[in-house]
Amino acid sequence: VDPDVDRLALVSENGEPFGEEYTLVAVSDYVLSKTPGNTVSNLSSTKALKIVTEKRKGIYHPAAVGEVNVVAKMKEITAVIGGEGNGGIIYPELHYGRDALVGIALFLSHLAQFGRPASMLRAQYPNYFISKNKIELTPEINIDAILETLKKKYAKHPINTIDGLK
């Protein structure tokens, strides 16, 4: 956990990171197996949550980056679980805030029910790569033109502009 106990990163039995992106995915999979419903994560999170949610017959909803945005969307759609790809789990059954201790309890419950090592649990989920880089922009760069170029280039793919371009 981090110092204010709102994010959770896990390590498997072989010393490999479970991946903080997949903390929310695994915990959500467990919650959805017990309480069917919808999920929310911010746009800087893996697509794997969408896949797991749809597999469990729920609807995934993206939200702008920031806990306040995720919580607002969760309340709007009455999500059963949500969070951020940084290991922040929000479980409204208890409260609307990121909580690593809740994440630990839910993850360990999932692992106990799964009955196999954490590495095998992680292998159950689709593997996506997400690059989180900060790009320094100067005033003369035309962001709108760049975004339009990217939208055209990737027109065959779903495009989300809630918070930037994904």
Summary of predicted features, one role per range:
Residues 35-166:
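Phosphate-binding and adjacent anionic-ligand microenvironments
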